[in-house]
Amino acid sequence: MTYNLHPAILVLKDGKFYRGWTLINSIISFGEVVFNTGMTGYQEIMTDPSYAEQIITFTYPEIGNTGINHEDNESNKIHVKGIITKNICFSPNNWRQQESFINYIFNNQIPHIFGIDTRALTKHLRKTGSMNGCISSQYLNPYLLSTKFKDRLSIESSDLVKQVTTSKNYEFQGYSHKHFSYLQYKTDKMYGYGLKIILIDFGVKYNILSRLDNYGCSIQILPATSSYETINAYNPDGIILSNGPGDPSIITYAIKTVKKIIKYTNIPIFGICMGHQIISLALEGTTFKLKFGHRGLNHPAGMKQKAEVTSQNHGFAVNQESLYKDTINITHFNLNDTTVAGILHNKKPIFSVQYHPEASPGPHDSDYLFKYFINLIKHFKQYKNYKNSSLAQAR
């Protein structure tokens, strides 16, 4: 298939603009412009619900080299508002490839622009912070496009979770296709067999479900708006609070629900990314917006002399000073900027991390946390009490 190139423009809210090319004529798309430093994983990133309402700048200069397959999607649709690249590979080659990247973006009409200086753009975003922007091939006048930002809501004032959460309760039955995972061949399917896990869906990635399924857990997925009474009626052995997009402080309904779960039950809880922030807010902590966020596959997280290389994708973080030391232990810091990356409750079986142990894309250093969660559930079911233990001991 042959494609025509059309001139396109990226305009930022501060007036900065970049000209490039697109394969789609007459597009216009608004979103928060952010950058991801990963060399791979573009398919997982575009289908990750945590990227809702965002335009992603890929800092790696060549995107699309390994094509697209039908197994690596992290949800059932594309969530990004657009993508920005230096170059797009027109001749990909990979043994798992089922479609070229250019076919994928053209067939799905994904707003995009390429041929711009992504290094200069990334340096600008690092200096000024993430901001709203627009990709357009419909209008090419930057001053005209600048006037269209007035009615655009910021990430901080939008409840993005309600856009991506499931609309109904359902039980995870595995995938109709084979969801590829290197780790599925190294997991004991009987290790968590029979355990009832409730997952609160703030924008869950498929691989979180896949990792739990690989351990043999029974997984019930509930909407983010589920009440304490609804969750408790399932009598779960454990609860996972998933990843998700946007500002966690806006998700007041979930914060209130988690606060009740913590107060009235001793159910083990594991929070991932947005789930980590929701737990912190339920424990009277606060969050703040990062200048340009953490989005990449090689963020070091740890404490003292031991660190994990982690996959991260968030624009908000927990304020360390807001956490009560008599209630919460900080287990991990982001070693790039010392923001809180993991916490452990002192008196209840609750822990959370500000990164993605399921990877997809990214390293597997923190995959042990799923097994730790299962061990926590087993311990509580057997002894009916919680003995505080270091996360490091679970490796």
Swiss-Prot record:
Keywords of this entry: Amino-acid biosynthesis, Arginine biosynthesis, ATP-binding, Chloroplast, Glutamine amidotransferase, Ligase, Nucleotide-binding, Plastid, Pyrimidine biosynthesis
Enzyme class: ligase
Pathway(s) it belongs to: Amino-acid biosynthesis; L-arginine biosynthesis; carbamoyl phosphate from bicarbonate: step 1/1; Pyrimidine metabolism; UMP biosynthesis via de novo pathway; (S)-dihydroorotate from bicarbonate: step 1/3
Cellular component aspect of the GO annotation: chloroplast
EC number in record: 6.3.5.5
UniProt xrefs under Pfam families: CPSase_sm_chain, GATase
Protein name as catalogued: Carbamoyl phosphate synthase small chain
The organism of origin for this protein: Gracilaria tenuistipitata var. liui (Red alga)
